[in-house]
Protein backbone atom coordinates (compact mmCIF):
# COMPACT_ATOMS: atom_id res chain seq x y z
CA UNK A 1 0.00 0.00 0.00
CA UNK A 2 1.16 3.55 -0.71
CA UNK A 3 2.15 5.96 2.07
CA UNK A 4 -0.86 7.80 3.46
CA UNK A 5 0.25 11.21 2.17
CA UNK A 6 0.67 9.90 -1.39
CA UNK A 7 -2.74 8.22 -1.42
CA UNK A 8 -4.33 11.38 0.00
CA UNK A 9 -2.67 13.46 -2.71
CA UNK A 10 -4.01 11.08 -5.39
CA UNK A 11 -7.50 11.35 -3.89
CA UNK A 12 -7.38 15.16 -3.90
CA UNK A 13 -6.11 15.24 -7.49
CA UNK A 14 -8.89 12.85 -8.57
CA UNK A 15 -11.59 14.89 -6.85
CA UNK A 16 -10.14 18.11 -8.23
CA UNK A 17 -10.16 16.69 -11.75
CA UNK A 18 -13.81 15.62 -11.37
CA UNK A 19 -15.00 18.97 -10.05
CA UNK A 20 -12.97 21.09 -12.46
CA UNK A 21 -14.08 19.12 -15.51
CA UNK A 22 -17.73 19.11 -14.38
CA UNK A 23 -17.54 22.87 -13.90
CA UNK A 24 -16.24 23.26 -17.46
CA UNK A 25 -19.20 21.22 -18.77
CA UNK A 26 -21.56 23.39 -16.72
CA UNK A 27 -20.01 26.57 -18.19
CA UNK A 28 -20.26 25.30 -21.76
CA UNK A 29 -23.86 24.23 -21.14
CA UNK A 30 -24.74 27.74 -19.98
CA UNK A 31 -22.79 29.45 -22.80
CA UNK A 32 -24.52 27.40 -25.51
CA UNK A 33 -27.90 27.04 -23.82
CA UNK A 34 -29.77 29.11 -26.39
CA UNK A 35 -28.16 27.28 -29.30
CA UNK A 36 -28.89 23.86 -27.76
CA UNK A 37 -32.43 24.94 -26.92
CA UNK A 38 -33.12 25.80 -30.55
CA UNK A 39 -31.71 22.50 -31.79
CA UNK A 40 -32.90 20.06 -29.11
CA UNK A 41 -35.78 21.91 -27.38
CA UNK A 42 -34.56 21.93 -23.79
CA UNK A 43 -37.43 21.42 -21.36
CA UNK A 44 -38.60 24.09 -18.92
CA UNK A 45 -38.69 22.68 -15.39
CA UNK A 46 -39.37 24.09 -11.93
CA UNK A 47 -37.56 21.28 -10.10
CA UNK A 48 -34.26 23.19 -9.77
CA UNK A 49 -35.24 26.83 -9.71
CA UNK A 50 -36.21 27.12 -13.35
CA UNK A 51 -33.10 25.48 -14.84
CA UNK A 52 -33.79 23.94 -18.22
CA UNK A 53 -33.44 20.18 -18.63
CA UNK A 54 -31.57 18.22 -21.30
CA UNK A 55 -34.25 15.84 -22.70
CA UNK A 56 -32.07 14.00 -25.21
CA UNK A 57 -31.33 10.86 -23.15
CA UNK A 58 -34.08 8.67 -24.58
CA UNK A 59 -33.79 5.84 -22.05
CA UNK A 60 -34.08 8.06 -18.96
CA UNK A 61 -37.04 10.04 -20.29
CA UNK A 62 -38.75 6.89 -21.58
CA UNK A 63 -38.70 5.07 -18.24
CA UNK A 64 -39.51 8.17 -16.19
CA UNK A 65 -42.56 8.83 -18.37
CA UNK A 66 -43.77 5.24 -18.07
CA UNK A 67 -43.05 5.27 -14.36
CA UNK A 68 -45.21 8.32 -13.76
CA UNK A 69 -47.99 7.02 -16.01
CA UNK A 70 -48.50 3.44 -14.86
CA UNK A 71 -45.48 1.43 -13.79
CA UNK A 72 -45.19 2.89 -10.28
CA UNK A 73 -48.80 1.97 -9.54
CA UNK A 74 -48.38 -1.51 -10.97
CA UNK A 75 -45.24 -2.04 -8.88
CA UNK A 76 -47.15 -0.95 -5.76
CA UNK A 77 -49.90 -3.37 -6.76
CA UNK A 78 -47.37 -6.20 -7.05
CA UNK A 79 -46.00 -5.39 -3.59
CA UNK A 80 -49.51 -5.46 -2.06
CA UNK A 81 -50.57 -8.68 -3.84
CA UNK A 82 -47.32 -10.48 -3.01
CA UNK A 83 -47.43 -9.52 0.67
CA UNK A 84 -51.08 -10.56 0.98
CA UNK A 85 -50.37 -13.86 -0.75
CA UNK A 86 -47.49 -14.50 1.66
CA UNK A 87 -49.75 -13.87 4.66
CA UNK A 88 -52.84 -15.74 3.44
CA UNK A 89 -51.65 -18.54 1.17
CA UNK A 90 -47.88 -18.79 1.06
CA UNK A 91 -47.98 -22.11 -0.83
CA UNK A 92 -49.79 -20.57 -3.79
CA UNK A 93 -47.90 -17.27 -3.87
CA UNK A 94 -45.92 -18.08 -7.08
CA UNK A 95 -49.14 -18.65 -9.04
CA UNK A 96 -50.82 -15.55 -7.62
CA UNK A 97 -47.77 -13.46 -8.53
CA UNK A 98 -47.81 -14.99 -12.03
CA UNK A 99 -51.48 -14.07 -12.58
CA UNK A 100 -50.81 -10.53 -11.34
CA UNK A 101 -47.86 -10.23 -13.75
CA UNK A 102 -50.08 -11.26 -16.66
CA UNK A 103 -52.73 -8.73 -15.63
CA UNK A 104 -50.12 -5.96 -15.24
CA UNK A 105 -48.71 -6.81 -18.68
CA UNK A 106 -52.23 -6.56 -20.13
CA UNK A 107 -52.69 -3.14 -18.44
CA UNK A 108 -49.68 -1.58 -20.20
CA UNK A 109 -49.26 -3.67 -23.36
CA UNK A 110 -52.79 -4.90 -23.95
CA UNK A 111 -53.81 -8.34 -25.17
CA UNK A 112 -51.25 -8.31 -28.05
CA UNK A 113 -48.42 -7.83 -25.56
CA UNK A 114 -49.55 -10.71 -23.35
CA UNK A 115 -49.98 -12.96 -26.40
CA UNK A 116 -46.50 -12.11 -27.73
CA UNK A 117 -44.80 -12.90 -24.40
CA UNK A 118 -46.81 -16.13 -24.09
CA UNK A 119 -46.05 -17.08 -27.70
CA UNK A 120 -42.29 -16.57 -27.39
CA UNK A 121 -42.15 -18.38 -24.04
CA UNK A 122 -44.27 -21.30 -25.25
CA UNK A 123 -42.20 -21.79 -28.41
CA UNK A 124 -39.00 -21.81 -26.33
CA UNK A 125 -40.56 -24.30 -23.88
CA UNK A 126 -41.65 -26.65 -26.67
CA UNK A 127 -38.21 -26.60 -28.33
CA UNK A 128 -36.55 -27.25 -24.95
CA UNK A 129 -38.44 -30.56 -24.70
CA UNK A 130 -35.90 -31.97 -27.18
CA UNK A 131 -33.22 -31.43 -24.49
CA UNK A 132 -30.87 -29.90 -27.05
CA UNK A 133 -28.87 -26.87 -25.97
CA UNK A 134 -28.09 -26.05 -29.61
CA UNK A 135 -31.77 -26.12 -30.63
CA UNK A 136 -32.77 -23.99 -27.64
CA UNK A 137 -30.13 -21.40 -28.48
CA UNK A 138 -31.16 -21.33 -32.14
CA UNK A 139 -34.78 -20.91 -31.08
CA UNK A 140 -33.96 -17.99 -28.75
CA UNK A 141 -31.81 -16.27 -31.38
CA UNK A 142 -34.51 -16.68 -34.02
CA UNK A 143 -37.17 -15.28 -31.67
CA UNK A 144 -34.84 -12.38 -30.89
CA UNK A 145 -34.28 -11.77 -34.59
CA UNK A 146 -38.03 -11.38 -35.18
CA UNK A 147 -37.91 -8.21 -33.08
CA UNK A 148 -35.79 -6.56 -35.83
CA UNK A 149 -37.79 -7.70 -38.89
CA UNK A 150 -39.30 -4.63 -40.54
CA UNK A 151 -42.53 -6.40 -41.54
CA UNK A 152 -43.07 -7.64 -37.96
CA UNK A 153 -42.25 -4.19 -36.57
CA UNK A 154 -44.90 -2.60 -38.79
CA UNK A 155 -47.53 -5.06 -37.58
CA UNK A 156 -46.66 -4.41 -33.92
CA UNK A 157 -46.74 -0.65 -34.43
CA UNK A 158 -50.33 -0.92 -35.67
CA UNK A 159 -51.33 -2.46 -32.34
CA UNK A 160 -50.59 0.74 -30.43
CA UNK A 161 -51.44 4.40 -30.62
CA UNK A 162 -48.00 5.71 -29.60
CA UNK A 163 -44.37 4.86 -30.33
CA UNK A 164 -43.67 4.61 -26.59
CA UNK A 165 -46.08 1.68 -26.26
CA UNK A 166 -44.39 -0.09 -29.17
CA UNK A 167 -40.93 0.49 -27.67
CA UNK A 168 -42.11 -0.82 -24.30
CA UNK A 169 -43.17 -4.06 -26.01
CA UNK A 170 -39.80 -4.30 -27.77
CA UNK A 171 -37.83 -3.74 -24.56
CA UNK A 172 -40.01 -6.22 -22.69
CA UNK A 173 -39.62 -8.97 -25.29
CA UNK A 174 -35.85 -8.36 -25.42
CA UNK A 175 -35.48 -8.83 -21.66
CA UNK A 176 -37.95 -11.75 -21.58
CA UNK A 177 -35.71 -13.49 -24.14
CA UNK A 178 -32.99 -13.94 -21.52
CA UNK A 179 -35.54 -15.30 -19.06
CA UNK A 180 -37.07 -17.99 -21.23
CA UNK A 181 -33.59 -18.80 -22.56
CA UNK A 182 -32.35 -19.39 -19.00
CA UNK A 183 -35.35 -21.63 -18.27
CA UNK A 184 -34.91 -23.57 -21.53
CA UNK A 185 -31.20 -24.17 -21.04
CA UNK A 186 -31.77 -25.35 -17.47
CA UNK A 187 -34.46 -27.72 -18.77
CA UNK A 188 -31.98 -29.06 -21.34
CA UNK A 189 -29.62 -29.94 -18.49
CA UNK A 190 -32.27 -32.17 -16.89
CA UNK A 191 -32.24 -35.80 -18.07
CA UNK A 192 -35.50 -36.78 -19.81
CA UNK A 193 -37.62 -39.04 -17.60
CA UNK A 194 -40.03 -41.69 -18.78
CA UNK A 195 -42.55 -40.79 -16.09
CA UNK A 196 -43.45 -37.43 -14.55
CA UNK A 197 -41.69 -36.87 -11.27
CA UNK A 198 -43.32 -35.25 -8.26
CA UNK A 199 -39.98 -34.03 -6.96
CA UNK A 200 -39.30 -30.34 -6.58
CA UNK A 201 -36.55 -30.54 -9.20
CA UNK A 202 -38.88 -32.15 -11.72
CA UNK A 203 -41.74 -29.76 -10.97
CA UNK A 204 -39.45 -26.75 -11.27
CA UNK A 205 -39.16 -27.18 -15.03
CA UNK A 206 -42.89 -27.32 -15.65
CA UNK A 207 -44.77 -24.88 -17.85
CA UNK A 208 -46.45 -23.10 -14.88
CA UNK A 209 -43.03 -22.35 -13.41
CA UNK A 210 -41.88 -20.97 -16.75
CA UNK A 211 -44.83 -18.55 -16.73
CA UNK A 212 -44.17 -17.62 -13.10
CA UNK A 213 -40.55 -16.86 -13.97
CA UNK A 214 -41.29 -14.96 -17.19
CA UNK A 215 -44.20 -12.92 -15.78
CA UNK A 216 -42.56 -12.00 -12.45
CA UNK A 217 -43.44 -8.33 -12.68
CA UNK A 218 -40.69 -6.40 -10.82
CA UNK A 219 -38.16 -7.44 -13.48
CA UNK A 220 -40.64 -7.79 -16.36
CA UNK A 221 -39.86 -4.75 -18.51
CA UNK A 222 -36.20 -3.91 -17.90
CA UNK A 223 -34.58 -6.50 -15.64
CA UNK A 224 -32.21 -7.00 -13.89
CA UNK A 225 -31.54 -10.59 -14.90
CA UNK A 226 -31.96 -13.38 -12.34
CA UNK A 227 -31.14 -16.87 -13.63
CA UNK A 228 -33.87 -19.48 -13.22
CA UNK A 229 -32.17 -21.73 -10.60
CA UNK A 230 -31.77 -18.77 -8.22
CA UNK A 231 -35.33 -17.60 -8.88
CA UNK A 232 -36.85 -21.04 -8.26
CA UNK A 233 -34.82 -21.71 -5.12
CA UNK A 234 -35.63 -18.34 -3.61
CA UNK A 235 -39.33 -18.47 -4.51
CA UNK A 236 -39.54 -21.89 -2.85
CA UNK A 237 -37.74 -20.73 0.28
CA UNK A 238 -38.02 -16.93 0.49
CA UNK A 239 -36.41 -15.02 3.33
CA UNK A 240 -39.58 -13.88 5.09
CA UNK A 241 -39.35 -10.52 6.82
CA UNK A 242 -41.26 -9.22 9.80
CA UNK A 243 -43.52 -6.21 9.29
CA UNK A 244 -41.02 -3.96 11.06
CA UNK A 245 -38.15 -5.22 8.92
CA UNK A 246 -40.21 -4.83 5.72
CA UNK A 247 -41.04 -1.24 6.62
CA UNK A 248 -37.36 -0.61 7.28
CA UNK A 249 -36.47 -2.07 3.84
CA UNK A 250 -39.09 0.18 2.20
CA UNK A 251 -37.92 3.31 4.03
CA UNK A 252 -34.23 2.77 3.26
CA UNK A 253 -34.90 1.69 -0.31
CA UNK A 254 -37.16 4.64 -1.11
CA UNK A 255 -34.70 7.03 0.51
CA UNK A 256 -31.86 5.77 -1.68
CA UNK A 257 -34.03 5.78 -4.81
CA UNK A 258 -35.11 9.37 -4.23
CA UNK A 259 -31.48 10.45 -3.72
CA UNK A 260 -30.34 8.69 -6.91
CA UNK A 261 -33.28 10.07 -8.91
CA UNK A 262 -32.61 13.59 -7.59
CA UNK A 263 -28.91 13.31 -8.49
CA UNK A 264 -29.70 12.08 -12.02
CA UNK A 265 -32.16 14.92 -12.55
CA UNK A 266 -29.66 17.45 -11.17
CA UNK A 267 -27.05 16.23 -13.67
CA UNK A 268 -29.32 16.69 -16.71
CA UNK A 269 -30.35 20.15 -15.44
CA UNK A 270 -26.81 21.41 -14.81
CA UNK A 271 -24.90 19.68 -17.63
CA UNK A 272 -26.37 19.24 -21.11
CA UNK A 273 -23.99 16.38 -21.87
CA UNK A 274 -26.33 14.38 -24.10
CA UNK A 275 -27.24 17.40 -26.22
CA UNK A 276 -23.56 18.37 -26.50
CA UNK A 277 -22.70 14.85 -27.67
CA UNK A 278 -25.41 15.13 -30.32
CA UNK A 279 -23.85 18.35 -31.66
CA UNK A 280 -20.71 17.41 -33.60
CA UNK A 281 -19.52 21.02 -34.19
CA UNK A 282 -19.67 21.83 -30.47
CA UNK A 283 -17.93 18.60 -29.53
CA UNK A 284 -15.11 19.46 -31.93
CA UNK A 285 -14.73 23.00 -30.58
CA UNK A 286 -14.92 22.64 -26.78
CA UNK A 287 -11.78 22.56 -24.64
CA UNK A 288 -10.05 19.36 -23.59
CA UNK A 289 -11.15 19.99 -20.01
CA UNK A 290 -14.74 20.03 -21.21
CA UNK A 291 -14.20 16.86 -23.24
CA UNK A 292 -12.92 15.11 -20.12
CA UNK A 293 -15.85 16.40 -18.10
CA UNK A 294 -18.33 15.24 -20.73
CA UNK A 295 -16.84 11.74 -20.70
CA UNK A 296 -16.99 11.52 -16.90
CA UNK A 297 -20.49 13.00 -16.81
CA UNK A 298 -21.75 10.53 -19.41
CA UNK A 299 -20.47 7.40 -17.68
CA UNK A 300 -21.48 8.61 -14.20
CA UNK A 301 -24.98 9.53 -15.38
CA UNK A 302 -25.30 6.08 -16.94
CA UNK A 303 -24.33 4.58 -13.56
CA UNK A 304 -26.78 6.70 -11.55
CA UNK A 305 -29.53 6.02 -14.10
CA UNK A 306 -29.18 2.28 -13.60
CA UNK A 307 -29.09 2.65 -9.84
CA UNK A 308 -32.65 3.94 -10.24
CA UNK A 309 -33.79 1.55 -13.00
CA UNK A 310 -32.42 -1.54 -11.22
CA UNK A 311 -33.01 -0.17 -7.72
CA UNK A 312 -36.82 -0.20 -8.02
CA UNK A 313 -37.13 -3.92 -8.93
CA UNK A 314 -34.38 -4.78 -6.43
CA UNK A 315 -36.44 -3.18 -3.64
CA UNK A 316 -39.55 -5.15 -4.62
CA UNK A 317 -37.55 -8.38 -4.83
CA UNK A 318 -36.20 -7.87 -1.31
CA UNK A 319 -39.75 -7.37 -0.03
CA UNK A 320 -40.66 -10.67 -1.72
CA UNK A 321 -37.85 -12.41 0.15
CA UNK A 322 -35.63 -12.73 -2.92
CA UNK A 323 -32.01 -11.66 -3.23
CA UNK A 324 -31.58 -9.42 -6.30
CA UNK A 325 -28.30 -9.17 -8.20
CA UNK A 326 -26.08 -6.49 -6.63
CA UNK A 327 -26.66 -3.00 -7.97
CA UNK A 328 -24.05 -1.56 -10.37
CA UNK A 329 -20.77 -0.59 -8.77
CA UNK A 330 -19.73 3.03 -9.21
CA UNK A 331 -17.86 3.48 -12.48
CA UNK A 332 -15.46 5.83 -10.70
CA UNK A 333 -14.13 2.78 -8.83
CA UNK A 334 -13.56 0.73 -12.01
CA UNK A 335 -10.03 0.40 -13.35
CA UNK A 336 -10.27 -2.63 -15.66
CA UNK A 337 -12.43 -4.05 -18.44
CA UNK A 338 -12.89 -7.26 -16.46
CA UNK A 339 -14.13 -5.36 -13.41
CA UNK A 340 -16.54 -3.29 -15.48
CA UNK A 341 -18.18 -6.37 -16.96
CA UNK A 342 -18.18 -8.23 -13.66
CA UNK A 343 -19.61 -5.54 -11.40
CA UNK A 344 -21.78 -3.17 -13.46
CA UNK A 345 -24.62 -5.46 -14.60
CA UNK A 346 -24.07 -8.47 -12.35
CA UNK A 347 -27.22 -10.28 -13.49
CA UNK A 348 -26.26 -10.09 -17.17
CA UNK A 349 -22.68 -11.12 -16.32
CA UNK A 350 -23.95 -14.19 -14.44
CA UNK A 351 -26.16 -15.13 -17.40
CA UNK A 352 -23.29 -14.79 -19.88
CA UNK A 353 -20.87 -16.79 -17.76
CA UNK A 354 -23.34 -19.62 -17.01
CA UNK A 355 -24.91 -20.02 -20.43
CA UNK A 356 -22.36 -18.74 -22.96
CA UNK A 357 -18.78 -18.53 -21.71
CA UNK A 358 -18.50 -21.74 -19.63
CA UNK A 359 -20.45 -24.02 -22.05
CA UNK A 360 -18.11 -22.92 -24.85
CA UNK A 361 -15.12 -24.02 -22.78
CA UNK A 362 -13.95 -20.71 -21.33
CA UNK A 363 -10.40 -20.76 -20.05
CA UNK A 364 -10.34 -24.58 -19.84
CA UNK A 365 -9.53 -24.99 -23.55
CA UNK A 366 -6.33 -22.99 -23.81
CA UNK A 367 -5.69 -19.59 -25.34
CA UNK A 368 -7.67 -20.17 -28.54
CA UNK A 369 -10.65 -21.53 -26.60
CA UNK A 370 -10.60 -18.51 -24.30
CA UNK A 371 -10.48 -16.10 -27.24
CA UNK A 372 -13.37 -17.82 -29.04
CA UNK A 373 -15.49 -18.10 -25.87
CA UNK A 374 -14.95 -14.43 -25.05
CA UNK A 375 -15.60 -13.31 -28.63
CA UNK A 376 -18.85 -15.30 -28.78
CA UNK A 377 -19.96 -13.82 -25.47
CA UNK A 378 -19.41 -10.26 -26.68
CA UNK A 379 -21.06 -11.07 -30.01
CA UNK A 380 -24.18 -12.26 -28.20
CA UNK A 381 -24.25 -9.13 -26.03
CA UNK A 382 -24.09 -6.95 -29.14
CA UNK A 383 -26.79 -8.97 -30.92
CA UNK A 384 -29.08 -8.90 -27.86
CA UNK A 385 -28.70 -5.14 -27.44
CA UNK A 386 -29.84 -4.48 -31.00
CA UNK A 387 -27.08 -5.48 -33.42
CA UNK A 388 -26.33 -1.94 -34.63
CA UNK A 389 -22.98 -0.91 -36.09
CA UNK A 390 -22.07 1.10 -32.98
CA UNK A 391 -22.81 -1.95 -30.79
CA UNK A 392 -20.66 -4.31 -32.87
CA UNK A 393 -17.79 -1.81 -32.71
CA UNK A 394 -18.23 -1.42 -28.95
CA UNK A 395 -18.34 -5.19 -28.42
CA UNK A 396 -15.23 -5.75 -30.56
CA UNK A 397 -13.30 -3.05 -28.70
CA UNK A 398 -14.32 -4.45 -25.32
CA UNK A 399 -13.30 -7.94 -26.42
CA UNK A 400 -9.93 -6.50 -27.43
CA UNK A 401 -9.63 -4.72 -24.07
CA UNK A 402 -10.46 -7.85 -22.05
CA UNK A 403 -8.08 -9.92 -24.19
CA UNK A 404 -5.15 -7.51 -23.79
CA UNK A 405 -5.77 -7.22 -20.04
CA UNK A 406 -5.84 -10.99 -19.71
CA UNK A 407 -2.64 -11.30 -21.76
CA UNK A 408 -0.78 -8.72 -19.65
CA UNK A 409 -2.01 -10.38 -16.45
CA UNK A 410 -0.78 -13.79 -17.63
CA UNK A 411 2.57 -12.30 -18.61
CA UNK A 412 3.03 -10.67 -15.20
CA UNK A 413 2.07 -13.93 -13.46
CA UNK A 414 4.72 -16.03 -15.23
CA UNK A 415 7.41 -17.17 -12.75
CA UNK A 416 10.23 -15.36 -14.57
CA UNK A 417 8.50 -11.96 -14.69
CA UNK A 418 7.05 -12.30 -11.20
CA UNK A 419 10.43 -13.11 -9.68
CA UNK A 420 12.11 -10.25 -11.58
CA UNK A 421 9.52 -7.74 -10.38
CA UNK A 422 9.75 -9.02 -6.80
CA UNK A 423 13.54 -8.71 -6.90
CA UNK A 424 13.72 -5.19 -8.31
CA UNK A 425 10.50 -3.50 -7.13
CA UNK A 426 9.44 -2.65 -3.61
CA UNK A 427 5.76 -3.22 -2.66
CA UNK A 428 5.12 0.52 -3.16
CA UNK A 429 6.78 0.48 -6.59
CA UNK A 430 4.76 -2.60 -7.52
CA UNK A 431 1.62 -0.73 -6.50
CA UNK A 432 2.63 2.23 -8.69
CA UNK A 433 3.23 -0.08 -11.67
CA UNK A 434 -0.24 -1.56 -11.14
CA UNK A 435 -1.74 1.95 -11.12
CA UNK A 436 0.17 2.91 -14.28
CA UNK A 437 -1.15 -0.12 -16.17
CA UNK A 438 -4.63 0.50 -14.76
CA UNK A 439 -4.50 4.12 -15.99
CA UNK A 440 -3.84 2.94 -19.55
CA UNK A 441 -6.63 0.38 -19.25
CA UNK A 442 -9.06 2.94 -17.78
CA UNK A 443 -8.40 5.43 -20.58
CA UNK A 444 -9.37 2.80 -23.16
CA UNK A 445 -12.30 1.60 -21.02
CA UNK A 446 -13.78 5.11 -20.97
CA UNK A 447 -13.09 5.65 -24.68
CA UNK A 448 -14.65 2.33 -25.74
CA UNK A 449 -17.73 2.83 -23.57
CA UNK A 450 -18.25 6.28 -25.11
CA UNK A 451 -18.80 4.39 -28.37
CA UNK A 452 -21.68 2.59 -26.65
CA UNK A 453 -23.09 5.76 -25.08
CA UNK A 454 -22.50 8.25 -27.89
CA UNK A 455 -21.73 6.29 -31.05
CA UNK A 456 -18.70 5.67 -33.24
CA UNK A 457 -18.38 9.33 -34.24
CA UNK A 458 -18.08 10.43 -30.60
CA UNK A 459 -15.40 7.78 -30.05
CA UNK A 460 -13.48 9.01 -33.11
CA UNK A 461 -13.67 12.61 -31.87
CA UNK A 462 -12.16 11.65 -28.50
CA UNK A 463 -9.48 9.51 -30.12
CA UNK A 464 -8.45 12.31 -32.47
CA UNK A 465 -8.52 15.15 -29.95
CA UNK A 466 -7.07 13.39 -26.90
CA UNK A 467 -4.67 10.82 -28.35
CA UNK A 468 -3.69 12.15 -31.80
CA UNK A 469 -3.99 15.95 -31.85
CA UNK A 470 -3.39 16.15 -28.09
CA UNK A 471 -0.15 14.18 -28.05
CA UNK A 472 1.92 14.50 -25.93
CA UNK A 473 0.66 16.99 -23.34
CA UNK A 474 -3.08 16.34 -23.35
CA UNK A 475 -2.59 12.57 -23.57
CA UNK A 476 -0.04 12.48 -20.76
CA UNK A 477 -2.16 14.81 -18.61
CA UNK A 478 -5.16 12.52 -18.99
CA UNK A 479 -3.05 9.46 -18.16
CA UNK A 480 -1.60 11.33 -15.17
CA UNK A 481 -5.05 12.09 -13.79
CA UNK A 482 -6.13 8.50 -14.41
CA UNK A 483 -2.96 7.30 -12.65
CA UNK A 484 -4.05 9.14 -9.49
CA UNK A 485 -7.59 7.94 -10.05
CA UNK A 486 -6.37 4.32 -10.33
CA UNK A 487 -4.42 4.50 -7.06
CA UNK A 488 -7.62 5.47 -5.23
CA UNK A 489 -9.66 2.79 -7.02
CA UNK A 490 -7.16 0.02 -6.30
CA UNK A 491 -6.98 1.02 -2.63
CA UNK A 492 -10.79 1.07 -2.47
CA UNK A 493 -11.02 -2.38 -4.10
CA UNK A 494 -8.42 -3.87 -1.77
CA UNK A 495 -10.16 -2.42 1.26
CA UNK A 496 -13.85 -3.02 0.52
CA UNK A 497 -14.03 -5.70 -2.19
CA UNK A 498 -12.97 -9.32 -2.25
CA UNK A 499 -11.37 -9.62 -5.67
From Swiss-Prot:
Chain ranges on the Cytoplasmic side, renumbered to this chain: 1-5, 85-94, 120-131, 184-208, 224-249, 317-369, 406-433, 488-499
Enzyme active site: 385
Disruption phenotype annotation: Conditional knockout embryos are characterized by a smaller size and holoprosencephaly at 10.5 dpc, shortening of limbs at 13.5 dpc, and severe short-limb dwarfism at birth. They die soon after birth. Testicular development is significantly impaired in XY embryos by 12.5 dpc. There is a massive reduction in testis size, a reduction in the number of testis cords which are irregular in shape and diameter, and an almost complete absence of Leydig cells.
Alphabetical UniProt keywords: Acyltransferase, Developmental protein, Endoplasmic reticulum, Golgi apparatus, GTP-binding, Lipoprotein, Membrane, Nucleotide-binding, Palmitate, Transferase, Transmembrane, Transmembrane helix
Membrane topology category: Multi-pass membrane protein
The reaction(s) this protein catalyses: N-terminal L-cysteinyl-[protein] + hexadecanoyl-CoA = N-terminal N-hexadecanoyl-L-cysteinyl-[protein] + CoA + H(+); N-terminal L-cysteinyl-[protein]-C-terminal glycyl cholesterol ester + hexadecanoyl-CoA = N-terminal N-hexadecanoyl-L-cysteinyl-[protein]-C-terminal glycyl cholesterol ester + CoA + H(+)
Alphabetized InterPro entries for the sequence: MB_O-acyltransferase, MBOAT_fam
Segments on the Lumenal face: 23-67, 149-162, 278-287, 387-389, 455-468
Compartments (UniProt record): Endoplasmic reticulum membrane; Golgi apparatus membrane
Gene Ontology BP term (one): smoothened signaling pathway
Chain segments carrying region Essential for palmitoylation of SHH: 91-155
Lipidation (S-palmitoyl cysteine): 188, 248, 330, 416
Binding residue positions for GTP: 454-461
Its EC number(s): 2.3.1.-
Residue stretches spanning the membrane: 6-22, 68-84, 132-148, 163-183, 250-277, 288-316, 370-386, 390-405, 434-454, 469-487
Any one of the GO CC terms: Golgi membrane
Signal peptide per UniProt: none
Molecular-function GO term, any one: palmitoyltransferase activity
Residue ranges within the lipid bilayer that do not cross it: 95-119, 209-223
Family classification: Belongs to the membrane-bound acyltransferase family. HHAT subfamily.
Purpose: Palmitoyl acyltransferase that catalyzes N-terminal palmitoylation of SHH; which is required for SHH signaling during limb development. It also catalyzes N-terminal palmitoylation of DHH. Promotes the transfer of palmitoyl-CoA from the cytoplasmic to the luminal side of the endoplasmic reticulum membrane, where SHH palmitoylation occurs. Plays a role in proper testis cord formation and the differentiation of Leydig cells.
Record protein name field: Protein-cysteine N-palmitoyltransferase HHAT
Amino acid sequence: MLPGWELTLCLLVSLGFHFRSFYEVYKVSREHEEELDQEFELEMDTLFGGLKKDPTDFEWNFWMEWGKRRLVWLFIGHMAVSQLATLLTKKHRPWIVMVYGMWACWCVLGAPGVVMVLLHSTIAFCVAQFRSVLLSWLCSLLLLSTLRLQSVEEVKRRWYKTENEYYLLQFTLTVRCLYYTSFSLELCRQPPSAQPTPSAQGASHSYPWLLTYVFYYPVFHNGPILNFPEFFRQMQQPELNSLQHSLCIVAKGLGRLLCWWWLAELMVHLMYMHALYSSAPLLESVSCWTLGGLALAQVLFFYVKYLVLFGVPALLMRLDGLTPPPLPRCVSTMFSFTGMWRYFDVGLHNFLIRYVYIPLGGSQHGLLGTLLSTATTFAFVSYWHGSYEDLWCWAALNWLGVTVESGVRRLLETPCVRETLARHLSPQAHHRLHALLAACSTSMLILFNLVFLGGIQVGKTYWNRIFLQGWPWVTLSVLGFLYCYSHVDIAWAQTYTVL
